[in-house]
Amino acid sequence: MTIVIPENYHAEKLLKDHGIVCKTPEEARKEKFPSIRIGILNIMPQAETYEFNLLYPLGRSILQVEPVWIRLKTHNYYSTENPHLENLYVFFEEAVAEKKLDGLILTGAPVEDIPFHEVIFWDEVCEIIDYA
């Protein structure tokens, strides 16, 4: 149905080219039915590039979806541009401070060859999962 994205979102044209309706948060607030807020903890390498792969199926839903991009305090995002993270992604506490999340998507890639509990940001991920 519809994806709620900020103005000038980098993948807006691509989403529209694939038949996804895009609205700004201001436009979405005027709708009769509220958006569902889906927290997306995207720890994939090159997060910016991977966002379309998440938004496209969400945009095919019968519901209006507002993605809430979440970043970790304890993870270094080496392969994603810092301005993109700072402009679009929020820390988990900020994501839930204004309004609860209706769902959570957790993405990642097995780029390290160590057990989960040894990954430096694992405790923070567990806190977010506990919330969900």
Summary of predicted features, one role per range:
Residues 128-132:
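Catalytic nucleophile loop
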Residues 2-117, 121-126:
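N-terminal beta1-alpha1 cap of cysteine-dependent amidohydrolase-like domains
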